[in-house]
Amino acid sequence: FFFQAEDGIRDVAVTGVQTCALPIYAHAAAVPLTGLTAWQALFEHAQLQPGQRVLIQSGAGGVGSFAIQLAKARGLHVISTASAGNLDLLRELGADQVIDYNAVQFEKEVSGVDAVIDGMAGEVRERSWKTLQPGGLLIALTGAPPTDAMAAERGYRQTTMLVHPDRAQLTEIAALIDAGKVRPILEAVIPLAETARAHRLSEGGHARGKIVLQVV
């Protein structure tokens, strides 16, 4: 994965142990950013352990779909939200409880979770606080970050994360892909010349998995 490289190209040779089972380049391109974001939220910031409970908002998205699979691979109890048309995908990815956020108020269905992975912000974040157990952690992936004071007023903790490159974590994710426990979900592979269409699709907020731009 050329996660830290930019503005350069060269020939390289890799051994079999440096590769993973993703024969389609678009699938490989979908792994580093979303995979590391999900991994670092779950295991670096929240430090979740087997048996703990996590609420993953927007589980059908790029980060959410990775987070569900990584959490289940670690033995977590996963609750996730999505629109009705994506609930089957969440179940397929391993979520223990799925919630249609358009049909019910998720905060009335969920309580006592150890962490919330929130990629939606706004009023969804405000409602997400109510699902945490005392001292639970809300991890904000987007939007205006909550403050420690806001969290303390509610009896919880919060953090805002910015993903960083990590070769060891990518190696662990690759091993899970090889083992068939994790797979990237793609909404679309779009030619670079149609970047504007890709942006419109992304900004619509209903992409199922990752949108990948194809350079050649």
Where are these regions (language model features)?
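Single conserved hydrophobic/aromatic residue that forms the stacking wall/gate
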Residues: 1-20
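Terminal helix/beta-alpha structural elements that buttress the NAD(P)+-binding lobe
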Residues: 18-216
